[in-house]
Amino acid sequence: MVPMTTLAPLGSGSDPDSFLRLGIPSKGRLSELATGLLNQAGLSFRRQNRGLFARVSGLPIDLIFLRTDDIPTLCAEGAIDMGITGSDLIEEAGANVEQRMAFGVGRCRLAFCVPDDEDYTDAAQLNGKRIATSFPHVTEQYLATKNAKAHLVSLSGSVEAMIRLGVADAIVDLVETGSTLAANRLRILEEIGHYETVLIQNGTHRCKEVADRLVSRLEGVVLARDYSLVEYNIPRSRVSEAEKITPGFNSPTINSLEDKDWCAVQVMVRRGEVVEVMERLKEIGASGIFEMTINNCRL
């Protein structure tokens, strides 16, 4: 394990070793995503002049801005306590870390991709071929399950151009929408796995109370993204019918109105179901139905 004292003290005042060290990506889309999640979870901080460190206001958490692919290794070695990174990078690094939660964003597939006009049907057919990838470890392990071995060309980016440049016969790369593959006249031959953005922690469980509090806050943000708050008025005689449509987690919140024959209902509904729910409520006599965004919640 890397001693915690190897990192320079952050800020001033409190002992930095009593602060949880959270590694987040220093740049790129994942950096923006991580920063947004932390802000939504109520973590206020200021990164000055693209510095490497920032202290969270009001919580014993220090942020360390790192290369995304270094976060799994640094977490496993104890240089940081927790980190936000991609599950693909954890697997590639072979890092011994605990996944505390998945954020449900940054989802992608790691796949073998070949030219459209090649008739490969199985990754085993790439035995002895040249494969360009940013994931040599994962690629080699997967090929071994196929009793195959290839010449791996390790790159840090622009993998999809390597076949046209004559560097490789196939590539292993992350695929989201597939538009980049289509633009380069490539197709997916075989998928290796599915990955997403996750929060990880090492086995020391240092600053456990702070870590658990951070997880709770982030879980509230992630859960809120899946739900909306629906409010409506309903005749009291139809409340039982309405509850079947909008049962909520435990039960809906029901408030009295000036008209004693009516009541107001508040309930959380999955965002993908809101439109249908509103239509069904209207059919049984509900009125004043509207949807509100939830930014954070605890259940």
Curated annotation (Swiss-Prot):
<comment type="pathway">
    <text>Amino-acid biosynthesis; L-histidine biosynthesis; L-histidine from 5-phospho-alpha-D-ribose 1-diphosphate: step 1/9.</text>
</comment>
<dbReference type="GO" id="GO:0000105">
    <property type="term" value="P:L-histidine biosynthetic process"/>
</dbReference>
<dbReference type="GO" id="GO:0005737">
    <property type="term" value="C:cytoplasm"/>
</dbReference>
<keyword id="KW-0963">Cytoplasm</keyword>
<dbReference type="InterPro" id="IPR015867">
    <property type="entry name" value="N-reg_PII/ATP_PRibTrfase_C"/>
</dbReference>
<keyword id="KW-0547">Nucleotide-binding</keyword>
<keyword id="KW-0028">Amino-acid biosynthesis</keyword>
<keyword id="KW-0328">Glycosyltransferase</keyword>
<dbReference type="Pfam" id="PF08029">
    <property type="entry name" value="HisG_C"/>
</dbReference>
<keyword id="KW-0368">Histidine biosynthesis</keyword>
<keyword id="KW-0460">Magnesium</keyword>
<dbReference type="InterPro" id="IPR013820">
    <property type="entry name" value="ATP_PRibTrfase_cat"/>
</dbReference>
<protein>
    <recommendedName>
        <fullName>ATP phosphoribosyltransferase</fullName>
        <ecNumber>2.4.2.17</ecNumber>
    </recommendedName>
</protein>
<dbReference type="InterPro" id="IPR020621">
    <property type="entry name" value="ATP-PRT_HisG_long"/>
</dbReference>
<comment type="function">
    <text>Catalyzes the condensation of ATP and 5-phosphoribose 1-diphosphate to form N'-(5'-phosphoribosyl)-ATP (PR-ATP). Has a crucial role in the pathway because the rate of histidine biosynthesis seems to be controlled primarily by regulation of HisG enzymatic activity.</text>
</comment>
<dbReference type="InterPro" id="IPR018198">
    <property type="entry name" value="ATP_PRibTrfase_CS"/>
</dbReference>
<dbReference type="InterPro" id="IPR011322">
    <property type="entry name" value="N-reg_PII-like_a/b"/>
</dbReference>
<keyword id="KW-0479">Metal-binding</keyword>
<dbReference type="GO" id="GO:0003879">
    <property type="term" value="F:ATP phosphoribosyltransferase activity"/>
</dbReference>
<comment type="similarity">
    <text>Belongs to the ATP phosphoribosyltransferase family. Long subfamily.</text>
</comment>
<dbReference type="Pfam" id="PF01634">
    <property type="entry name" value="HisG"/>
</dbReference>
<dbReference type="GO" id="GO:0000287">
    <property type="term" value="F:magnesium ion binding"/>
</dbReference>
<keyword id="KW-0808">Transferase</keyword>
<keyword id="KW-0067">ATP-binding</keyword>
<dbReference type="GO" id="GO:0005524">
    <property type="term" value="F:ATP binding"/>
</dbReference>
<dbReference type="InterPro" id="IPR001348">
    <property type="entry name" value="ATP_PRibTrfase_HisG"/>
</dbReference>
<dbReference type="InterPro" id="IPR013115">
    <property type="entry name" value="HisG_C"/>
</dbReference>
